[in-house]
């Protein structure tokens, strides 16, 4: 017999987490637990404030309706629901059907923030392929350019992923590029969405020989994966994109065109983050995912991230907001 439960969680965040100028003091989300009478599986539904199109309240209503349809054995159209619900529910179904492999890729590209001198030491000590991520566009582009150039100059085997979140005008993007030595530009694996529009970003890449990646653009209406000069990758944030099936389709389209697909976090708890690491190992085995977000939390949820010492909140301690 099918059963279902929906839990609600609130996890405290590190004080330094800022999303589009809003401080995120706690992460709120839902956990859907499905059982077929033999197996039990879970998925996480956690719209990201300032980024998701839906609120937590809208996601909750959507999730309850979808769960009732599943219990009634109705045909499900997951991506007709809001993206965070489509992702969390599809992940629970994948787990229930034992289709998500257990092995995960926990080698996250570290997010560089804090003292550059400390970071240089940390990055020099990294083993294996050295890839790190830097958020740009928060300060003056000249400062960003100097910092990026410094890292590439001091660590000769480092590659960088940069993310500007569409934060620059064409002029500011040019100012940034002017401070990156031409010989280092090929070691920028990609710069996510440098300019306000995709057209400006494409022109920037052509003018500077700095590869770019689509992130927000992937979620624009009518987006299709296509070969475009300068575009090296697409970044897939399942909580913002939709069902696992939709994400896999985007990954396969990118791979067919010789592009990277990078599975990336939307600051989910350790429950969903470990599932994303497993999805990455399964579908993007050659690519380091963008999942270095567990240190933004003060607490984990249900499933522990490997080698993370943060305390783990148990589902049994959470509020059950709905069950059949």
Curated annotation (Swiss-Prot):
It catalyses: (1R,6R)-6-hydroxy-2-succinyl-cyclohexa-2,4-diene-1-carboxylate = 2-succinylbenzoate + H2O. GO terms for molecular function: magnesium ion binding; O-succinylbenzoate synthase activity. CDD domains: OSBS. Mg(2+) binds at residues 163, 192, 215. Its cofactor is a divalent metal cation. Keywords: Lyase, Magnesium, Menaquinone biosynthesis, Metal-binding. Pathway: Quinol/quinone metabolism; 1,4-dihydroxy-2-naphthoate biosynthesis; 1,4-dihydroxy-2-naphthoate from chorismate: step 4/7; Quinol/quinone metabolism; menaquinone biosynthesis. InterPro entries: Enolase-like_C_sf, Enolase-like_N, Enolase_C-like, Mandelate_racemase_C, OSB_synthase_MenC1, OSBS_N. GO terms for biological process: menaquinone biosynthetic process. Coiled coil: none annotated. The active site is at 135 (proton donor), 237 (proton acceptor). It holds the Pfam family MR_MLE_C. It comes from the Bacteria. Its EC number is 4.2.1.113. HAMAP family: MenC_1. Belongs to the mandelate racemase/muconate lactonizing enzyme family. MenC type 1 subfamily. Converts 2-succinyl-6-hydroxy-2,4-cyclohexadiene-1-carboxylate (SHCHC) to 2-succinylbenzoate (OSB). This is o-succinylbenzoate synthase. It comes from Aliivibrio fischeri (strain MJ11).
């Amino acid at each position: 017999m099918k059963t279902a439960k929906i839990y609600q969680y609130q996890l405290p965040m590190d004080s330094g987490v800022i999303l589009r100028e809003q401080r995120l003091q706690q992460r709120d989300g839902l956990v859907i637990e499905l059982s077929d009478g033999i197996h039990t599986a879970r998925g996480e539904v956690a719209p990201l404030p300032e980024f998701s199109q839906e609120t937590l309240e809208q996601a909750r209503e959507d999730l309850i309706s979808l769960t009732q349809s599943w219990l009634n054995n109705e045909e499900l159209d997951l991506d007709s629901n809001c993206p965070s619900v489509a992702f969390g529910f599809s992940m629970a179904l994948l787990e229930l059907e034992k289709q998500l492999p257990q092995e995960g890729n926990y080698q996250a590209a570290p997010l560089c923030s804090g003292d550059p001198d400390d970071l240089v030491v940390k990055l020099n000590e990294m083993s294996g392929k050295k890839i790190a991520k830097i958020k740009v566009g928060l300060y003056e582009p000249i400062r960003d350019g100097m910092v990026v150039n410094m890292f590439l100059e001091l660590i000769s085997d480092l590659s960088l992923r940069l993310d500007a979140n569409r934060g620059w005008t064409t002029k500011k993007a040019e100012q940034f590029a002017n401070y990156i030595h031409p010989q280092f530009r090929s070691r920028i694996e990609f710069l996510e969405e440098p300019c306000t529009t995709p057209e400006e970003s494409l022109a920037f890449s052509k003018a500077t020989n700095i590869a770019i990646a689509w992130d927000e653009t992937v979620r624009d209406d009518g987006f299709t994966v296509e070969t475009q000069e300068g575009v090296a990758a697409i970044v897939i944030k399942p909580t913002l994109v939709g069902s696992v099936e939709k994400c896999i389709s985007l990954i396969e389209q990118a791979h067919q065109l010789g592009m990277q697909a990078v599975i990336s976090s939307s600051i989910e708890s350790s429950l969903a983050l470990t599932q994303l690491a497993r999805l990455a190992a399964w579908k993007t085995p050659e690519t380091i995912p963008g999942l270095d977000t567990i240190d933004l939390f003060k607490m984990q949820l249900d499933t522990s991230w490997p080698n993370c010492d943060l305390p783990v909140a148990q589902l049994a301690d959470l509020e059950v907001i709905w069950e059949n």
